[in-house]
């Protein structure tokens, strides 16, 4: 870590050191420091101190003034004569390194690890974790269907022979969003209208589906990231980037030195209102609930998690003074990961945004325990490599498992690493390296004692990794086949479907494909059948798993398919599993550019609702 002890103490702002340093900087710039707009809220944190287990890697500051000083100090390093400035531009993600090393394979012919079946949530959404519902544009209670299209909510009765529209409700100031459903309340989370990043949280009473009523609206001055529903608790993650300031650029009247000094004065005069989110004019998070990372390379911004129960106007909040969009929720954990640093083009000259610095090829991890409305910091750590997205993380029995892609800090391979929570730190417990030499991770699926990882460059290695002993993860087997799977869906202990792209032997992709795998023997993985779709097609589940639906009673998978490389037709591909084979039937369901809106929602009656841009109808699976 390129940080001296003085630098660390300044970033953590423990005591008065950071306050003094920033005050001197502000004084030198000719600007009087301003405190927070609100009275010091140090003792107002609901639910106790969320950082009572804070470590040196992530800790709250000593006061609101110290928190503001830490923001200002870090921001002054990012400002220049053109405003917020980036560094020299290059990609610090997967890098085409070369090597001949091979992964070690575990010996033995049997394994404890097994796959298990994944099903849609009770509200009809294909989710990552069982029991943790995810937002979507369509939700159901099996009697009614609720659809959000832009700012319009439409309710339907789906208990009869055909869906019947019941009501429409316009949601004011909402540009686009998604929903969570709990009992008779919908919670809509989405982007508000206007130029400034805003998250709208709208609660709607749908106890009378024919007359939905808005019961509460919250406006958060931050951009939406994601949301989850745990039992009756909604958690919404929002982010604040670098603030919009009235920066000046060099011109005939002002040179670079003058522009830089002007811009530095603006940064030094920022208040907490510029860095922290507000809800309807009030501070959304207390100073005591905001922690500052130790790592000086961490992106500057604020990531806030809001927790509340639908119908209750109170919330609890916790925040980390960084910016990322990678958030993974398990049943009792929230894990945040910083994104790999990357950029391209000429040096950045922006008024505001996420500025990606060159970084060091490491990923920072922050783990929180979820208990009711409380979101409590548990541990933080650092790993070498890049975490692509939330699907690259998993949590089981207090162990965080991550799939890591290549960066400048790693070898020319991918890895699976397990980490323990120990005294506020995430400590590496075990690892498997040398997965996919010179290849990129395309998909990951986790189970209690197993990870399935797909990498690709010219061939598609599918790796099975035994995680039953977190301190000694083992590579059980691998399968190399053309093409690759971008989404893996387990059907049970013996079968798995992969949705992705077919490819030529040289790695050139040709079109979408669906593959059926036999995973009953993890030391001998087999692809038993493959459906290859027409050239230049794409499968929606490859980028949005909510466009995949598994119907266990019918032994049928439904996936959305488009020809949007050069056309505008959307199909539903019904894949019936018959032993080791796939029987495919394709139905054109929509035309136009809105293929991403198509959903296939299973009902408890056995029917499936097809939602397109134009209509809502029942889909004939047979």
Model-derived regions, located:
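Beta-sheet-rich non-transmembrane sensory/scaffold domains
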Residues: 2-622
